[in-house]
Amino acid sequence: IMSKIAVIGFGSLLWDLDDLAPKVSGEWKMYEGPVLPLEFSLVSRKRHYALALVIDYGDVAPCPTCVIDSVRSEIGAAIVDLANRERMAPTNIGFVDRNTGESHSHREETRKIFWNWIDDRDYDGAVWTDGERNFEALTGKAFNLQTAQDHLRSLQGIPLEEARRYIRNAPARVDTTLR
């Protein structure tokens, strides 16, 4: 049987599929993904140290995510596709697979959210970027509105442009402390 796999997006994936483009079909279904706690608390090396959205269980607001269909029918291939786009190891891609009952995430809470979401959907699996906040580790400061703004103010040139574009382009309903 053919499996239908959802790719869940909440950050730059929505406006920059990059090398994932040939591996998905159709348009983004806006705000039809699971509701996740999101914050701009990931310092992204890929994006020149701009702040990027990450699933974050700190004091953050739940935000709706978006869905696009993978062309893959095998969860492992969908994981590798997303890992390649994110320039990260497959272990940093979360997944739930209804066919095998297997799943992976750094956080049990996230797996529960995805199992609940997929339960009454027409998908057999889902993959998502399962990064973890690293703001404290990379800046040495606790994440809050002030320290995040200070970090953004410290950026210049290309990193600053990247940061502005990312925060501006994030979906309108991603309503976080920083935004």
Placement of each model-derived feature along the sequence:
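A glycine-rich, hydrophobic/aromatic-adjacent loop/helix-cap motif
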Residues: 2-179
